[in-house]
Amino acid sequence: MKRGLIIVCACLLIVSSFFSGCGTSDTQSTTEEVTQATEEQTTEATSEEVTETQEETTEEAEKASVSEESPVTYEYTQVDDSYFNDAVFIGDSISYGFELYVTEKRANGETVLGEAKFLTSGSLSYGNSLWDVSDESVHPTYNGVKMKLEDAIAQIKPGKIYILLGTNDVALYGVEQTIANADTEISRMLEASPGAEIFIMSTTPKYSPAESDVDGALNNADIDALNVAMWQFAVEKGYNFMNIAPLFKDETGGLAADYCSDKEGMGIHFTSAAYDIWLNFLYSYGKQQ
């Protein structure tokens, strides 16, 4: 098991390294790939930083801890399908693609992610998840009924809630408001299922050639800024953070071509090779019980 701790006073010095790309476009989805991709995110603290960290109290260090060698903020272990029996995955069209990927594997007789459920919808965001349900809203459906996330969570009562949102937030709302909306929505979900573990996954990158200089357009600089802020938010709130974004980056910091299914379009959606990596990551980084 790997575990590394770093505290808030060093956070600002390592975030650019922690959220940098892994520089891979290989399509194999082995544990070795995930290990290599995550190890490239490590950095060493200077003697001056160490001196500063020693001045922190143990309580502050634990509150601000984040793994330096690992892309997650908790003690982790390899898990099997049963671990996900009480899990629900929430997300936008990228996660909807993952739902289709898992559903196809299950239809072919594979046991994938146990009995995990999905609440996904195209264009879903932290922001619009707070809106009232209507014909125009993009809330996901559960048992055939469109409903707010917290209402679906109240019915499912999951023990683990995995969230991948932000792609449809950051360009529209900015980083600060996105974090505020995330705080509101996650609080509502926890009221609906007290005791559930929250796992926030970092927003995944955009294919660099698809980026635009137009004001208000989604770009990787804003995505990276959101991920740093979301990481800090998760640590402060006691939520689990999973930094999956670097697994899919190329040397430019954008979504690697082999992992992008819409290079001529939005440049944000995944190929099956990317979903292979994501699935393997989930099994490799279960939370130590």
Regions flagged by a language model, labelled:
Residues 206-289:
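Catalytic His-Asp segment of secreted/periplasmic serine-dependent ester chemistry enzymes
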Residues 176-185, 223:
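Charged helix-capping and loop-helix junction motifs
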Residues 81-179:
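Conserved SGNH/GDSL esterase-like catalytic core that processes O-acyl groups on lipids
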Residues 1-7:
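Positively charged n-region of N-terminal signal peptides that target proteins for export
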Residues 99, 103, 154, 166, ...:
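Sec-exported extracytoplasmic/periplasmic mature domains
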Residues 24-86:
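N-terminal, intrinsically disordered, polar/charged segments of Gram-positive cell-envelope systems
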Residues 18-21:
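C-terminal motif of bacterial Sec signal peptides marking the signal peptidase cleavage site
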Residues 164-168, 190-224:
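Active-site segments of SGNH/GDSL-like serine hydrolases
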